[in-house]
Amino acid sequence: MNFETVIGLEVHVELNTNSKIFSPTSAHFGNDQNANTNVIDWSFPGVLPVLNKGVVDAGIKAALALNMDIHKKMHFDRKNYFYPDNPKAYQISQFDEPIGYNGWIEVELEDGTTKKIGIERAHLEEDAGKNTHGTDGYSYVDLNRQGVPLIEIVSEADMRSPEEAYAYLTALKEVIQYAGISDVKMEEGSMRVDANISLRPYGQEKFGTKTELKNLNSFSNVRKGLEYEVQRQAEILRSGGQIRQETRRYDEANKATILMRVKEGAADYRYFPEPDLPLFEISDEWIEEMRTELPEFPKERRARYVSDLGLSDYDASQLTANKVTSDFFEKAVALGGDAKQVSNWLQGEVAQFLNAEGKTLEQIELTPENLVEMIAIIEDGTISSKIAKKVFVHLAKNGGGAREYVEKAGMVQISDPAVLIPIIHQVFADNEAAVADFKSGKRNADKAFTGFLMKATKGQANPQVALKLLAQELAKLKEN
């Protein structure tokens, strides 16, 4: 029997506000343990939450970016559970009336087709702290993350393969990043994914029993975990067994999913309205204000890069996959840089340098201004493409002006015939054997002089000018 795969994803996105959702403490990542905490985060008796307006702003932007309806009257709920990283013994979240609902996103699949994936809801909530189990036998609680604002985006069960799930996450990450509400860095926990997967016989409308997957710390592991589950569940069903509703984690080392616990239902959390927070009204004016702050999204940018700038679909897709790269490209073109040349550098030398150094574009000294200047001095013949690679490395590490560096470092290309011709004559004088081979008609003897000339000029001869002059002088040499 063959089965249809049914996948839905729950994505937690950490919002990039300066402070937490219900307390004024810093929400920034990377500080010392428990440095970003106060009495609200520790749940001292008598403290009350105060909603951060910036979190609602971000929630509205997310809902608009994902084509969602917005609840004009919004409230929060308590989700009750006990765990050491949750001092209140409940989480403030949204249950029956999330900020956004009934949305969708269009994703591009590997075969070039597109598919619309439904989004059931997007709700605001606070993050929990973090438990660390030490080798000394003690467990430690860090509450820096406690109260950091999250938006949980819950898709419809519209994906039919691990590949579609991967494409959905890629598109979702792009949209959230472009909306400016999160840096969506999985390595820092600002984007976390849980997957729900079930199988059913083809033609059956009723969903099968779902399994939830956790510990999916990369898009690649999401795909691998889902691929494993497809095989595991299919084998159980074909052998006459039943799938249990459970939570499993993906073990990267063993490339398998492992049982964590039997899955809880919503009733286990005993949701009820948060009594310490009022009902919040979101006006049409507020929504429209947030709409005006949204930028051009990747799909629209890709289309413009192709139609207005003449880039290929591939180049446009690569440039817009990351907002930082796309914004850099936009500024470079606005400064007068040739779109194709800027694109080639960003996808070629720049990308290779970043991979080798383990850095991002924001972490190096290259700017749109000095990249455009470097491309300009390649085009006007000041430097060759070969020299430009060395210039780029200097700019990436040290910044500064491209032309100024080239002149100070003595890298200016030699293009003046009055300078090159005497050097060519000296090359002839220094390589009498090669001259004799050339005059005798030895095959490809002329090729050696190109290397001699570039060596004599330390690679600074303008190749086009130098080759033309060399051919001219060799012709004269043959006549004599």
UniProtKB/Swiss-Prot annotation:
Q: List the disulfide bonds.
A: none
Q: Which reaction does it catalyse?
A: L-glutamyl-tRNA(Gln) + L-glutamine + ATP + H2O = L-glutaminyl-tRNA(Gln) + L-glutamate + ADP + phosphate + H(+); L-aspartyl-tRNA(Asn) + L-glutamine + ATP + H2O = L-asparaginyl-tRNA(Asn) + L-glutamate + ADP + phosphate + 2 H(+)
| Residue intervals passing through the bilayer | none
What's the domain of life for this entry?
Answer: Bacteria
List the coiled-coil residues. Answer: none
Q: What is its EC number?
A: 6.3.5.-
Instruction: Provide the alphabetized UniProt keywords.
Output: ATP-binding, Ligase, Nucleotide-binding, Protein biosynthesis
Single Gene Ontology BP annotation: glutaminyl-tRNAGln biosynthesis via transamidation
Alphabetically, the GO molecular function entries are: asparaginyl-tRNA synthase (glutamine-hydrolyzing) activity; ATP binding; glutaminyl-tRNA synthase (glutamine-hydrolyzing) activity
Family membership: Belongs to the GatB/GatE family. GatB subfamily.
Q: What assembly does the database describe for this protein?
A: Heterotrimer of A, B and C subunits.
Q: Function of this protein?
A: Allows the formation of correctly charged Asn-tRNA(Asn) or Gln-tRNA(Gln) through the transamidation of misacylated Asp-tRNA(Asn) or Glu-tRNA(Gln) in organisms which lack either or both of asparaginyl-tRNA or glutaminyl-tRNA synthetases. The reaction takes place in the presence of glutamine and ATP through an activated phospho-Asp-tRNA(Asn) or phospho-Glu-tRNA(Gln).
Question: What protein name does the entry list?
Answer: Aspartyl/glutamyl-tRNA(Asn/Gln) amidotransferase subunit B
